């Protein structure tokens, strides 16, 4: 409990900008499924029911808020649930980057992550053929490592 309180207080001060943006996004998504994932607030939103301008949000972290888009029809599928858990761990790693970089997070992590995401998914077949994983570069590789390390720690 103390760990979560410290995490939230740092996110709301040092990571204020991205946490405020995350809170706004959470409110814009409306009534969706919210829960704590470790210390962060995770929103699993149904991509078919959110407002049009939010449909392409994908999976993203903003401060202490994690957003994962999923089609409601696929929500109970075990393979998809396992993949969502892996994505949640990765996105949780981004929340640790927020703790480290604070007000510079959006410049150091957010912008490069967005550019890499757009580039990777526009050339996915080419990168896959060359054996290049989405998670092979900064900041994605670091986020995955942080998410894995956080998952190994005792609660």
What annotation goes with each model-predicted range?
Residues 1-2, 94:
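A short, terminal or domain-edge coil/loop segment
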Residues 67-89, 134:
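Short pre-active-site segment immediately N-terminal to the catalytic Zn-binding motif
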Residues 99-107:
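Transmembrane alpha-helical segments and their cytosolic interface motifs
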Residues 56, 82-86, 105:
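Alpha-helical hydrophobic/aromatic positions enriched in membrane-embedded helices and signal peptides
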Residues 2-55, 61, 66-70, 106-155:
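Metalloprotease/metallohydrolase-associated module, dominated by Zn2+-dependent proteases
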Residues 86-98:
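Active-site recognition of the HExxH zinc-binding catalytic motif
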């Amino acid at each position: 409990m103390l760990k979560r309180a410290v995490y939230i207080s740092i996110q709301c001060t040092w990571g204020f900008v991205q946490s405020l943006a995350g809170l706004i996004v959470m409110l814009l998504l409306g009534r969706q499924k919210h829960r704590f994932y470790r210390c962060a607030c995770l929103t699993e939103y149904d991509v078919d029911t959110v407002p049009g301008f939010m449909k392409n949000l994908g999976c993203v972290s903003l401060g202490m808020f994690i957003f994962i888009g999923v089609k409601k029809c696929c929500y109970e599928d075990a393979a998809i649930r396992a993949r969502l858990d892996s994505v949640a761990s990765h996105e949780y790693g981004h929340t640790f980057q927020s703790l480290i970089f604070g007000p510079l997070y959006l410049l150091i992590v957010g912008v490069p992550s967005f550019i890499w995401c757009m580039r990777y998914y526009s050339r996915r077949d080419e990168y896959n053929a060359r054996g290049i994983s989405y998670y092979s570069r900064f900041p994605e590789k670091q986020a995955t490592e942080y998410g894995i390390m956080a998952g190994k720690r005792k609660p």
